[in-house]
Regions:
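Juxtamembrane loop-to-helix connectors within ABC transporter transmembrane domains
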Residues: 4-5, 13, 45, 80, ...
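Hydrophobic alpha-helical transmembrane segments of ABC transporter permease domains
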Residues: 25, 76, 80, 88, ...
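Helix-loop-helix
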Residues: 52-58, 154-168, 238-311, 316-317
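Short intracellular "coupling" helices and adjacent cytoplasmic loop segments at the cytosolic face
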Residues: 89, 97-121, 125-127, 200-224, ...
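ABC-type nucleotide-binding domain
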Residues: 325, 332-577
Length: 577
């Protein structure tokens, strides 16, 4: 799992191999200069203590070389950091873009069955964690590899016996780090999962503050939050504690190696095999050799978090896409709006059918109303019309063309939709109204707003049509939001209309005005209206009464009342005095 995740992250880095080469080159130059400085230092020491004479001319020249080397190290360390950060940020940008685009490709069922807060956390928090891990990995990896190889060469030049001992003993720290890393991986994965859960809960809590306060749910909400928060603390603490053991453990091993090198080197220096300057140089190299091992284990916690986060991101990218449109998809030209449904069966969960053997023939320009108790399949019927979900069996056609033979985008452009939830995005009122028709003129927008009885309240807004709408339309009433959604649907000038509980949150006077506007826009257009308020659908050409996924009654308002069946009971339950 970990290896496959790392390989996939590396594929995102591949397009930036040019920058990678520059980063590696910077690392090589920086480390080479760093490794040469101890040689200069050793020479300076030997020039000071050799035979009791100080060669000031040589020492001064060496100091100048050291100063130039230090400046070079600083410059090339900066360039290495710059290039690695660019690679990291570009990789994060690409990864986040792919995850966001993936939401356009997955079926609606995926979005419906996953917490929105958790999905948001994967796009924001998890991708950021991957970026942080990449930055640390690059910085430690590039300089670390070059440092290890370079110090090995220099140590073998000075004394191959001590060098061999250092090379054999130091990797013991890697075994310690690997053991701790394996032990903590699952804990870091659980930590990322809990962060997604808590993000989801906070989003739900903040987005529904009116309900929370209306039911005095604050204390219970806090108790629920505290459970998530405490579990995240516990899991996070255990993960961080276990991860934190890696660095001191490896430092202890490497410190013991360094001490052994110092003792053995001192003995060889006394024996005359090494000069004092060479011993000083060797000790510096031994320290630099062990340093990358210490640094890697120091960022092990962050790398583990990054791997766990990348796994969650790739879980989204690996989700099954909507079936692709057929390459020979048919485009319905000059759509008239004839819709035919033949023996449709559908279920959200296998073995739990919701719509069974559903058939309906809708002629162009007909106004179809769908009513029934909650959960009877009304909204599901709309989902099937728009191909948000595909039927299990049966066929839905528009003007004789099976909708599965059409491109989804082309099918959905035929419909104008007003949903039960009035969705508006952060932007001006004008931008929101043009959402379905970006090429509409301002005059066309205003005409649509007037037809939807939204123009009057828009004019009273601080900046009129340029008024900014806050997140989810928080600075508008529910009725105002629905009026804007209705105007948006009108502006798209669709062939067919879908109205899902469109007027359920509008006051009676506004509802009457909206019904008049809808009567105008529905002229000549096939329209499907889903509503619980039966007063809004009296003028429909056909009313379908659904229960348990089946049409149990069908006819006009008067015909259904005359039958004295289920529809009459629904109607009388709403208007009983």
């Amino acid at each position: 799992m970990k290896k496959s995740v790392v390989r996939r992250v590396l594929k995102y880095i591949k397009p930036y191999k040019g920058l990678l080469a520059l980063a590696i080159l910077s690392a090589i130059i920086s480390v080479s200069l760093t490794l040469y400085i101890p040689v200069l230092t050793g020479n300076a020491i030997d020039n000071i203590i050799d035979k009791g004479n100080v060669n000031f001319e040589n020492v001064l020249q060496i100091i100048i070389y050291i100063a130039v080397g230090v400046a070079g190290v600083a410059i090339f360390q900066w360039t290495m950091t710059y290039f690695t950060n660019v690679i990291s940020y570009k990789t994060v940008r690409d990864l986040r873009r792919d995850v966001f685009c993936k939401f356009n490709d997955v079926p609606l069922s995926y979005i419906d069955t996953h917490s929105h807060g958790d999905l948001i956390s994967r796009v924001i928090n998890d991708v950021d964690a991957v970026g942080d891990g990449l930055s640390q990995m690059f910085l430690q990896l590039f300089s670390g590899i070059v440092t290890i190889l370079g110090t090995m060469v220099f140590m073998f030049i000075i004394d191959w016996r001590i060098a061999l001992a250092v090379i054999i003993l130091t990797p013991l720290s890697l075994f310690v780090a690997a053991f701790i890393g394996k032990m903590t991986h699952n804990r870091f994965a659980r930590q990322q999962q809990l962060q997604g859960d808590i993000s989801s809960y906070v989003e739900e809590y903040v987005g529904n503050q009116r309900i929370v306060k209306a039911f005095s749910y604050e204390d219970r909400a806090f108790e629920n939050f505290e459970k998530y928060n405490q579990e995240l603390y516990t899991v996070g603490f255990k993960a961080q504690f276990a991860g934190a053991l890696a660095n001191p453990s490896t430092r202890f091993v490497n410190a013991m190696v360094y001490a052994a090198v110092g003792i053995f080197g001192a003995i060889t220096a006394i024996a005359g095999t090494l000069s004092v300057g060479q011993l000083s140089c060797f000790l510096t190299y031994a320290n630099q050799y062990t340093k990358p091992f210490n640094e890697v284990t120091g960022v092990l916690t962050q790398l583990q978090t990054a791997i766990a986060a990348a796994g969650r991101v790739f879980d989204v990218l690996d989700a099954e896409n909507e079936p692709e449109d057929k390459p020979d998809s048919i485009k319905v030209e000059n759509c008239k709006g004839n819709v035919k449904i033949e023996n449709v069966n559908f279920s959200y969960v296998k073995d739990k059918p919701l719509i069974t053997n559903f058939s309906l023939d809708v002629k162009s320009g007909s106004h179809i109303a769908i009513v029934g108790p909650t959960g009877c399949g009304k909204t599901t019927f709309i989902n099937l019309l728009m191909r948000f979900y595909d039927t299990d069996s049966g066929k839905i056609s528009v003007d004789g063309v099976d909708i599965k033979d059409m491109e989804r985008d082309e099918l959905r452009k035929l419909y104008g939709m007003v949903l039960q939830d009035s969705w508006l995005f952060c932007g001006t009122i004008m931008e929101n109204l043009k959402y379905g028709n970006p090429n509409a003129t301002d005059e066309e927008v205003i005409e649509a707003a007037k037809a939807a009885y939204a123009h009057s309240f828009i004019r009273r807004m601080p900046d009129g049509y340029d008024t900014m709408i806050s997140e989810s339309g928080g600075n508008l009433s529910q009725g105002q939001k629905q009026l804007l959604c209705i105007a948006r649907a009108m502006l798209s000038n669709p062939t067919m209309l879908i109205l899902d509980e469109a007027t359920s949150s509008i006051d009676t006077l506004t509802e009457i005005r909206v019904q008049k506007a809808f009567a105008k826009i529905m002229q000549g257009r096939t329209s499907f209206v889903v509503a619980h308020r039966l007063s809004t659908i009296k003028e429909s050409d056909v009313i379908l009464v659904m229960r348990d996924g089946n049409i149990i009654e069908q006819g006009t308002h008067d015909e259904l009342l005359a039958k004295g069946g289920f529809y009459k009971n629904l109607y009388e339950s709403q208007f009983a005095k």
